[in-house]
Amino acid sequence: LSLRRQRQMCIRDRSCAHLLKELPDFNSSLAPSGKAIIRKKYVNIGFAVDTPDGLLVPVIKNVDQKSLLQLAAEAASLAEKARTKKLSADEMQGACFTISSLGHIGGTGFTPIVNAPEVAILGVSKATIQPVWDGKAFQPKLMLPLSLSYDHRVINGAAAARFTKRLSDLLADIRTILL
């Protein structure tokens, strides 16, 4: 991964970790009985890696407790292991939330599928400069298409909208997650 892409991924992952703590229903799973919600006390995030044999999802554990440099190093190491078929089963287990990024391929959006027992997954498409009306004129703005899929048994549409809105706010001003 390029250094620029690693930085972007770390900021995105750290922002999601921040939200998983702020909005704990997204950091949960449904009990096998379907009658209880299990809230996680840890924040483990899976990220999809495109390999010649298909997508693999390594998991960065305790994302909320790691620095951006630690996240970058671990993500790069896990992605390389995935591409070279050296990823262990343990390195692909325990995610609370998954992020699938197809921005490097292109496209404006997609519908990611929730990886049970997780209750949500974030899809990230390619960022592009778009004209945005500021009330007086169109201004060029960097826009990042986000697609959030979620289990309606745990998360409702309003909560999902708040999650994506809050994530957009965090990504637009990363000072909150750096403190």
Segments from the language model and where they lie:
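C-terminal catalytic/motor cores of large multi-domain enzyme assemblies
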Residues: 5-8, 12-179
